[in-house]
Amino acid sequence: MRLFVSEGSPGSLPVLAAAARARGRAELLISTVGPEECVVPFLTRPKVPVLQLDSGNYLFSASAICRYFFLLCGWEQDDLTNQWLEWEATELQPVLSAALHCLVVQGKKGEDILGPLRRVLTHIDHSLSRQNCPFLAGDTESLADIVLWGALYPLLQDPAYLPEELGALQSWFQTLSTQEPCQRAAETVLKQQGVLALRLYLQKQPQPQPPPPEGRTVSNELEEEELATLSEEDIVTAVAAWEKGLESLPPLKLQQHPVLPVPGERNVLITSALPYVNNVPHLGNIIGCVLSADVFARYCRLRQWNTLYLCGTDEYGTATETKAMEEGLTPREICDKYHAIHADIYRWFGISFDTFGRTTTPQQTKITQDIFQRLLTRGFVLRDTVEQLRCERCARFLADRFVEGVCPFCGYEEARGDQCDRCGKLINAIELKKPQCKICRSCPVVRSSQHLFLDLPKLEKRLEDWLGKTVPGSDWTPNARFIIRSWLRDGLKPRCITRDLKWGTPVPLEGFEDKVFYVWFDATIGYVSITANYTDQWEKWWKNPEQVDLYQFMAKDNVPFHGLVFPCSVLGAEDNYTLVKHIIATEYLNYEDGKFSKSRGIGVFGDMAKDTGIPADIWRFYLLYIRPEGQDSAFSWTDLLIKNNSELLNNLGNFINRAGMFVSKFFGGCVPEMALTPDDRRLVAHVSWELQHYHQLLEKVRIRDALRSILTISRHGNQYIQVNEPWKRIKGGEMDRQRAGTVTGMAVNMAALLSVMLQPYMPTVSSTIQTQLQLPPAACRILATSFICTLPAGHRIGTVSPLFQKLENDQIENLRQRFGGGQAKGSPKPAAVEAVTAAGSQHIQTLTDEVTKQGNVVRELKAQKADKNQVAAEVAKLLDLKKQLALAEGKPIETPKGKKKK
């Protein structure tokens, strides 16, 4: 067989990725041809990719070629995969071809490209979310995944065309993009030029016809699709759960101290990367580790799983010695000072550690030395002489953080002796260009020193076997998988585990008494020692791999030490240690249009947040809303204002406050009787579906996406109130008053559910709602899997008051100036912000009502198969109303670019 591909041919991407599967199954020659070369003699125009079979026949559809390769590998066809392939050909390709032509050939950008794509991208995201599987056709990669990945890659490799709200699509795309066959295919076709590599090929192709305009918006489509997929059986099941109420909740487990695993139950051990004690954490540090882990820990407790959440300050190493010199203190004094600062910051942010410890303890020394001795006796420790930088003026070897210079990889002028902050690459200090001693600023010289190394090559097979068993069925984030795969692909090398320092865990070996363990060897052991300081039964957590699920949260730069160095250490120690099952790594959070910098006064740091006057829960909400899960994200003051005033004040807070106020004002503070109509029953089922979706997302640690489920339920609640108008019905006849009671009772129960769903994200707000509604204790501490009636008729609520305050533009502008952040690129101007925040809640209610009514008009016309022009006119009205509503709610509206069609 011979496969013909072309550089810059989009169809060559999936074909090359699929061809990698067929290697060894058949003799395959791959030839690269020009875009004008006619391979298939009977086609009227040149076309690649082409597969010439041994029989002399040709396959010249990318999908057909991929199918052929998969069949060679023994793939068995299934209906779902075939359905995806049909959809790709009939729905995705027309939209995608037009978008690529607009971008590459015509040079258009932004919404001109993304606008037509939103529907198809949302469909993929929604399908992945619904089936709760990592791939399109199930738990394993299929032909459909390769074909759709190849089709989408040229566009989605640019984060601008992969909307952040499509979390399931992001995760799927990144998982496939990090696989070696896909990476090689991308390198072959795009040649590291990105989408521009397609220009020559696409210029030779006929211009694709643009897809017909959509008759409804994506948000409307989503809404209809979700409701339409609820079967009568779904509704009956949901209503049955609703009617059981609190009886359906399991018995409330008593809280124990210390928290210990229980055989036969779900036992979850959660760690957050240990922050360096000498640094005050900024918002990016907080969301990357402790806050993300806190959300998951709180969720696990709501599920009544035995959950231990721990963290602590990483106190040994060169960074501490350097900070001590700067401040004229001893290392111990520095550790005491900054440990207290860290603890205070996390306390203010509401981080619910079961224990927050430190690494400068006798337990740390004992456990680290024990693991080292076991590695030593088993032959996994090497001795070698290392070339090191020595400062003759200071008469000492310079450990990595005592030296700075120019990065040998990217040229960054302030690179440390261990890692470059700009490119992230690990560095040996002697590789630095123009090195300087951080203490005296003199130029150090190279000298030799004997050190100990962890023999990672000798442990590589054990590591790969463990990864092969662990990662496929786990929730490792795509970036964590990619980072570890990259290290293994390059081959592991012995890793130095000692340093010429005073402040650290002593090395218990003759001849090395003047050295300490390298912080990257013993810092991860800190999780174990912190647990040992929490309970003398620590081995029930850390030497119990069969019964404990270990989740570790971190920023992506910490992945090699948690996914490679620490596992190799304990695998070599052969002492039945619990190994990580799930590594949850974030990308980086930037500040406005730059980076956080304490020295330059740029960005909000943890000790400053409480001085802004903005409550901790608002910070939590916004950081979790923009959590950098699939790509870097940026903190923006303008966006914080918009999200607070729209999502919290006008959406979530407005609904919960109205629900409670209706009970107080119209029904004397007692929940009224509820007589559910078919529409109410359907709403119960829809809320249950959204709740189950929330569970599925959080069980997969998709924290940002699960937050959207909360906001979706509150939006439906607002719409439910607007449509049914209980404030009017309460003044009517008996039937109207009964209807007002049902709507109010349903709404206040939705508010009760939201209070529990909010608990992992906004614990103080959650507690406030539960106090206002006088929620029963069991309902506060257990999150049901279905929407149940927790506030039955006759339940008396407490005093209801607003949950959130509006953020004013002047207030935010002052904070932006105070923290040194310039206006973020692309952010609305102050006048625009005034416009989006000026609308009152009554105006928003009116617009919401109008959108609902107009949506019903459009749906009815479509159901009647009315004249297309009539439908188009009504759709235009609906779009205009939605635009007005988005503006009133403070949601940014993209101005269409380019010329209008005539």
Curated annotation (Swiss-Prot):
Modified positions (Phosphoserine) are 827
Q: Name one GO molecular function term.
A: ATP binding
**What is one Pfam family matched by this protein?**
GST_N_5
Which InterPro entries does the record associate with it? Answer: aa-tRNA-synth_I_CS (IPR001412), Anticodon_Met (IPR041872), Glutathione-S-Trfase_C-like (IPR010987), Glutathione-S-Trfase_C_sf (IPR036282), GST_C (IPR004046), MARS_N (IPR041598), Met-tRNA_ligase_1 (IPR023458), Met-tRNA_synth (IPR014758)
**Keywords, comma-separated and alphabetical:** Aminoacyl-tRNA synthetase, ATP-binding, Cytoplasm, Ligase, Nucleotide-binding, Nucleus, Phosphoprotein, Protein biosynthesis, RNA-binding, tRNA-binding
> Positions modified as Phosphothreonine?
837
Broad EC category? ligase
What positions does the record give for the motif labelled 'KMSKS' region?
A: 595-599
Q: Where does ATP bind?
A: 598
**Does the keyword tRNA-binding feature in the UniProt annotation?**
yes
Q: Which residues form the WHEP-TRS domain?
A: 843-899
| Domain GST C-terminal residue range list | 74-212
One GO BP annotation of this record: rRNA transcription
**Locus of motif 'HIGH' region:** 275-285
Which terms in the GO cellular component ontology are assigned? aminoacyl-tRNA synthetase multienzyme complex; cytoplasm; cytosol; mitochondrion; nucleolus
Write out the function statement from the record: Catalyzes the specific attachment of an amino acid to its cognate tRNA in a 2 step reaction: the amino acid (AA) is first activated by ATP to form AA-AMP and then transferred to the acceptor end of the tRNA. Plays a role in the synthesis of ribosomal RNA in the nucleolus.
Q: How does it assemble?
A: Monomer. Part of a multisubunit complex that groups tRNA ligases for Arg (RARS1), Asp (DARS1), Gln (QARS1), Ile (IARS1), Leu (LARS1), Lys (KARS1), Met (MARS1) the bifunctional ligase for Glu and Pro (EPRS1) and the auxiliary subunits AIMP1/p43, AIMP2/p38 and EEF1E1/p18. Forms a linear complex that contains MARS1, EEF1E1, EPRS1 and AIMP2 that is at the core of the multisubunit complex.
The similarity comment for this entry is: Belongs to the class-I aminoacyl-tRNA synthetase family.
Q: Which NCBIfam families match?
A: metG, PRK00133.1
This one is known as Methionine--tRNA ligase, cytoplasmic
Species this protein is from: Mus musculus (Mouse)
- Gene name per UniProt: Mars1
